[in-house]
Amino acid sequence: MIAVLTGFSFGASSIALFARVGGGIYTKAADVGADLVGKVEAGIPEDHPLNPATIADNVGDNVGDVAGMGADLFESYVGSMIGAMVLGALFIGSATVSADAGAALAFGTDAKFEGLGAVLLPLFLAAVGIIASMIGTMFVSVEEGGNPKSGLTRGELSAAFIMLIGGFFLITHLLPEAWVTTKLVDGETIITGSYTAIGVFYASLLGLACGIGIGLVTENYTGINTGPVTEVSRQSVTGSATNIIAGIGCGMRSTTWPIIFIAIAILGAYHFAGLYGIAIAAVGMLANTGIQLAVDAYGPIADNAGGIAEMSELPKEVRERTDSLDAVGNSTAAIGKGFAIGSAALTALALFAAYMGVAGINTINISNPSVMACLFVGAMLPFLFSALAIDAVGRAAGDMIKEVQRQFKNIPELKAALEKMQANDGKPVEEWSEEDRKVYEAADGKAEYANCVSISTSAAIREMIKPGLLAVLTPVAVAFGFKIVTGDAAIAAQALGGLLAGVTVSGVLLALFQSNAGGAWDNAKKMFEMGDGVEVDGVYHKKGSEAHKAGVVGDTVGDPLKDTSGPSLNILLKLMSVIALVIAPLLVAEGDQKTNGNATAGGANTEEATGKPSANDITANEDSGDGNTTDEANDENNTDDGNGESQPESGGGS
């Protein structure tokens, strides 16, 4: 079963890599090229039909922010459920203790759902989440002139409330009221952890609360007219350098509370339900993925609507309305990215816990030099991955810029229309002279949009190869490299665990920084384009001012961070954890034969006889549930193997 589940998750992760990384390169190559040549060099409005990169830019919004985000959240969705199902499978055959004592099988064949309640729970929670999302969309409504953000928030909170109610009844029905995990030591069964159904519910509640909390913090650091974004826009008055400095500071500060929320969710979920609780927290956060995806798609839809309004030369007030919608869309997109990063962190931890269970690892000893070395390598990988993604955008954007400049120079109709537009300096086309209008209209359809689309497409396919290989090959190289060099599969499993720990911690922080810094730069630029612009020392700086141009530069710097490298790190974290889970059986078999003489961790003999894992399988791989652990028994029966790793003396667990 585990092999089938991990294979499915690996497939979801692989496609997410292509959609997120490739989509990010596609959209930002077009966006950066269109902005630098169109808005900064030529001085024409965003999404103007004279800009050959306009179509590629609008298509890219859908490729990166809809398809890419959807694949990212789907990967987290699948990964969290599979991590929880694998850990739930370890409960099969364990014993439960009610409040009045008296042991009975909790997950045996005579229990609820033939003992598969813990395995089926993630699937049922996902089903309730789909229903909750459908109902939540009914609460999304805005009165004429109202704030669309309030309607979207109301829908999300409604879905979350429904999810909590449904989740409570599901968890209490599928799981026994209370149970314990045990470990066989010298023929004696030792209780290693105790759990309750209500504890599992609290774990799911913590995951849901963590997702909402990350969204609120992200909105504060990236939303229009919030303190941090206003400060970034005000710093634009003194030039691009101060704008970029302020944005970097904003992005770094924005990592604080999301990490605290994730830490609280991890500690709380582990306290209430052990490693299974961490996986259920990830499922709880992602159960309402349906409505979250709908909210994330709002931004690209509003952005494309503005592009269509500009290309169709609709009245000025139409573009102003779409710009206000787009500003809200930038915030929802930033919140969605924060949510995706938080969910990726919990999903990676769930998969990491499942890897430890399958590989038979009780603890990872960071004083072991192999583990410490791999921790550093893992922490380095997100920076290298981001560098590859950013460099890819830079190269593709350079090709796009050359193509747009070539068309402005070599297509006579475009060149003449651009000169007339610059001569009229922002005046509506209706106020131009008849001669100028004829020149402008002659350029209609002369731009070679297909060339720009082709550049983005080929760049996305070509440039995703290096980041993809880095994510896929590194865990395989580390695991089997250590196995070949040391000849010890147990050391290889520990080293791979260190690699995953390093990449998860570093990757989450870097992803939050890049995503939120880019979002702050984006909306700081938008503030110059709305209403009276940005007021500094009694002077209003509007669209087209030097401060606005500095904001455009900051936004251009932030584009590849928030839409390519930052979100792509989610895929790196989860894909590496999934690959580790896939290859874990190849690491555990030999290691266990060396230490225990068994083919699996602690319970191979029982599994051979009964056809299902023994109680030893469960507790050998999960150290404690909610802190009620008999550590003394573990300490008495562990010895040092000389490498700083504890090994059981008996075959009861490893």
Where are these regions (language model features)?
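Hydrophobic packing and interface segments
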Residues: 1-612, 617-618, 654
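Long, low-complexity, intrinsically disordered segments
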Residues: 612-654
